[in-house]
Design a protein with these regions (language model features):
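Short, solvent-exposed secondary-structure capping/transition elements
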Residues: 64-79, 92, 96
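Alpha-helical repeat scaffolds in large eukaryotic proteins
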Residues: 38, 60-68, 84, 88, ...
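Short, aromatic- and cysteine-enriched interfacial helices/patches
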Residues: 1-6, 162-163
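Low-complexity intrinsically disordered segments
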Residues: 99-163
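N-terminal interaction modules that seed assembly of large macromolecular complexes
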Residues: 29-72
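Short terminal alpha-helical segments
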Residues: 5-46
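Amphipathic alpha-helical scaffolding segments
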Residues: 74-86, 140-151
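Residues within HEAT/ARM-like alpha-solenoid scaffolds
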Residues: 50-54, 58, 78, 96-101
Length: 163
């Protein structure tokens, strides 16, 4: 969970800035990420689909609980719907089927966070979604996620002193 504990922090500004940075990094590194996923998944799982099922929900899950706790359920649902619209307008528009899988993935991640039974586990989520995990998939996912998240996490932390 994000350690939002200081009253001087603008939660909306910090969260918005963080996701804007992530989105920019995602766009900038899209081809490299796509190449990684081509090697991480079997032929039955298109790489574009894998990105939206794995990387984006993982990034979203980083802030899902604290944002909901601070903003409240109504505001959280509004922000989530806006995010889905933005994802839908990006490189590989998601069909209703993919949106449902995205939401299911997010639900699985939240359950693991809430009951403390699991942190983000790519292979477990892949199996829950009926896909076949490949060797090194989790490591590749983790490294790609870290590549995108860490620089912006650092910038947001320096600006808003989250820690």
């Amino acid at each position: 969970m994000w350690p939002f504990g200081k009253s001087s922090i603008s939660i909306v500004a910090a969260t918005t800035e963080f996701y804007v940075g992530i989105s920019a990094a995602f766009e900038k590194n899209y081809e490299a990420i796509l190449a990684t996923f081509h090697t991480a998944y079997d032929e039955n799982c298109p790489a574009d689909e894998a990105i939206y099922m794995e990387l984006m929900p993982a990034v979203w899950a980083l802030g899902i609980e604290p944002v909901q706790n601070i903003w409240g359920e109504h505001e959280f649902k509004r922000v989530r719907s806006e995010m889905l619209v933005k994802i839908n307008q990006s490189h590989a528009p998601m069909t209703e089927f993919l949106v449902e899988r995205f939401l299911r993935h997010t639900q699985l991640l939240r359950e693991g966070i809430r009951n403390g039974s699991a942190t983000y586990n790519a292979d477990h989520i892949i199996k829950q979604l009926g896909l076949a995990p490949q060797p090194m998939t989790s490591i590749k996912l983790a490294s790609q996620l870290a590549m995108l998240v860490l620089p912006y996490w650092k910038e947001v932390d320096q600006k808003y002193r989250l820690f």
